[in-house]
A protein has these predicted regions:
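Glycine-rich beta-strand-centered segment in the early N-terminal region that forms part
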Residues: 20-35, 48-97, 131, 137-143
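NAD(P)H dinucleotide-binding glycine-rich loop of Rossmann-like/cofactor-binding domains
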Residues: 92-162
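Short Gly/Pro-enriched turn/cap motifs at secondary-structure boundaries
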Residues: 7, 19-20, 53-59, 112-117, ...
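Extracellular beta-rich ligand/substrate-recognition surface
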Residues: 5-12
Length: 162
């Protein structure tokens, strides 16, 4: 599959990588339908994120369709349209339980997706066991309309998927 990959400071490349597969019971494979470049991706490119791993597929802002789920995944099923939380978190540590998932103490907690683990600037993304239970949200038709800019003046769209 085609991916947008961080190679080294100042250098990203379109690269072919194998399609991800389930590795853990809490994994999900999502076919990416829309992805966005974030200023965080640019910070990686410009060398401002020393923990970014060369060779990683960037991107943590995406939507898609669930293709496959591990045996412990209960909140989504294949065929569901989802939006992906930009934060990776365990859901069990002190900070996660208080709602401060960006401070998760797990080694892959905080901002890992597209920085330390392969992200969504690709055809498919594996959302690892380090993606907490609440990280996949249903994407409804109103949200899709807002994302694809098919909304008309006067329409009302959701601004969050909590």
């Amino acid at each position: 599959m085609l991916t947008y990959t961080y190679v080294s400071e100042g250098k990203f490349e379109l690269m072919e990588k194998p399609k991800p597969v389930l590795q853990h019971e809490r994994d999900a494979i999502v076919k990416v339908t829309l992805a966005s470049i974030c200023s965080s991706d640019l910070h990686i490119k410009h060398g401002s994120v020393p923990r970014a791993v060369p060779g990683i597929t960037v991107g943590h802002e995406m939507v898609g369709i669930v293709e496959e789920v591990g045996s412990a995944v209960t909140n989504v099923k294949p065929g569901d349209r989802v939006t992906v939380n930009v934060e990776t978190f365990c859901g069990e540590c002190f900070f996660c339980k208080k709602g401060f998932v960006n401070n998760c103490t797990d080694q892959n907690g905080g901002w890992a997706l597209g920085c330390r683990i392969d992200g969504g600037q690709a055809e498919y993304v594996r959302l690892s066991e380090h993606i907490g239970k609440l990280s996949l949200g249903y994407l409804n038709n109103t949200s899709t309309g807002a994302i694809k800019k098919t909304m008309e003046p006067g329409d009302i769209a959701t601004s969050g998927l909590a």
